[in-house]
Each structure stands twice: as C-alpha cells, then as structure tokens.
C-alpha cells in the first residue's frame, strides 16, 4: 500500500515554519509562484560579508507539502551559501524525480518522500528553495551595484 501523501509528520511541519515574517530591511527580496498548484512565496534575505545568509523572512501561501518544505528549509538556512542552496535544489528535484535516493546536502528533506509519486506537488516542494535562491541572487546584484566605481 502506498504511503499517505499528508503524513502526520508533514502536517506537523506545515504548522511550524520558522522565520514566517517579512524583514523590514533586507539585502535581497524575491517572490515566486509554482505554476501548477498556485503556491506562492515571498522571501527576504540578509547576507554577511562572506555571502552567507544571516537573516531570512518568509511569507508563504502553499499546500501542506510546500509549507513543510519551507519549514525544513528554515530549520537549517542560516549560514548557507548560494552554491549550497543551488546544489540542494538540484538534488531535491532529482530526488523527487526518482533519479537519486537521497538529498545529501539537506537530509531532513527526506521527510517529504511520500510526495515523490505526486509530480503535481513537486513545484510546491521546490518553491521555498527557488524563492530563497532568487532572493539571494537579488542580494548579490544589489551588493555589486552598491560597490564604489
């Protein structure tokens, strides 16, 4: 028998998203939408001089899987770099597609394994990482533009 999609653990995660408040001052901001399911997320980030996340603010309107993914991301996001986030998104997409068996860069994402056969939910699961990457990239552009000529 197939594992239920909305497990007790996923539902618990969906109600425990950290950093669920936008930042007043941020280095970068982004808003993204998952086209298939309509989930939406806004993200604000602050970076240190070494280009690692020091603060994050989230506003998410998504299904329980998207919220659970945001919660798992939020648990371990502080101190992460852009290459780490991009590698995690790459692994997450490959894991959901059945191409790899685990997400070594962010092991807690394995809690979303019940969603692997549900391709229509993959966009909501990837949305938190796509949005934080976009906010990070916006911060990098803003910092570059702020450099003296």
What are these regions (language model features)?
Residues 8, 26, 43-44, 57-59, ...:
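Generic ordered-secondary-structure signal
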Residues 1-21, 30, 80-149:
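C-terminal binding/interaction regions
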Residues 16-60:
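Structured beta-strand/loop patches that form or line metal/cofactor-binding pockets in enzymes
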Residues 41-42, 51-52, 74, 84-87, ...:
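Short, surface-exposed, polar/charged, turn-prone segments marking secondary-structure boundaries
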Residues 37, 65, 117-121:
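Secondary-structure capping and boundary motifs in well-ordered enzyme cores
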Residues 61-67:
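Short, thiol/selenol-centered motifs that function as redox-active sites or metal-ligating centers
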Residues 69-81:
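Alpha-helical support elements that line or immediately flank enzyme active sites
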């Amino acid at each position: 028998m197939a594992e239920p999609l909305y497990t007790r653990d996923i539902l618990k995660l969906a109600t425990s998203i950290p950093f669920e408040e936008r930042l007043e001052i941020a280095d970068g901001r982004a808003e993204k939408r998952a086209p298939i399911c309509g989930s939406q997320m806004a993200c604000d980030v602050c970076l240190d001089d070494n280009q690692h996340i020091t603060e994050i603010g989230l506003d998410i309107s998504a299904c329980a899987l998207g919220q659970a993914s945001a919660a798992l991301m939020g648990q371990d996001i502080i101190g992460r770099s852009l290459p780490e986030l991009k590698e995690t998104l790459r692994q997450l997409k490959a894991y959901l597609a059945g191409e790899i068996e685990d997400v070594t860069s962010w092991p807690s994402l394995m809690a979303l394994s019940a969603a692997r056969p549900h391709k229509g939910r993959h966009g909501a699961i990837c949305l938190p990482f796509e949005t934080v990457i976009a906010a990070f990239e916006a911060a990098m552009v803003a910092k570059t533009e702020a450099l003296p000529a």
